[in-house]
Amino acid sequence: SYYFLMSWAMLYLALSYASEVRAAERRAARFAQAAQQAELRSLRYQVNPHFVFNTLNSLSTLVLRNRPEEAESMIMNLSTFYRTSLTGDPLDDVPLADEVQLQQLYLAIEAVRFPDRLKIEIDVPDAVMSCCVPGLILQPLVENAIKYGVARATRPVTIRITAREVDDVLNIVVSDDGDVIPSDQDKGSGIGLANVRDRLDARYGSAARIEWYVPFEGGFVV
């Protein structure tokens, strides 16, 4: 009958529309995932050019000061750093042990540059070494500590990397005990911290965050 055919036609149209909506939602989800992956890759590789620039400046200084052995050591550490950091997928997380090892390589490079000023303390228990974190997530924080804490100081400055697991949440702290920074030079407004914040947000959303403060006696804690 007419009404029977109309009912079937309406049902067919409704099912077709629902199918198209689901297909559109799946396409939107794929596009959103692709955009997030592209964003994560972009943020990951923002770190590297800045690091290369600083290292080449350091190498140039060593060569000009006729310190070839130290320059060779820095080149070897840089080579190891890049061979390790660039072999993995930027979207993959890495064990905290690997991330700490990368920062030890980076700090070894900077120790050649600041032999009398840079002191290093790493306090990361074995119990959290297997926890996974985004690759190179600590690099901007350690670079900031070098740039604002060590490079501007006239005395020894200690950079500390610590990690603890509290209530199933991994807390990582990078700090330095450098001098009090002028009020017009806010470490918390730099590209490095914004990079870490954006990467954490893109990777974990509200499940992760970054915080920082300036101790009264000076230095910086992230």
Enumerate the language-model features and the residues they cover.
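Two-component histidine phosphotransfer core
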Residues: S1-F216, F220-V221
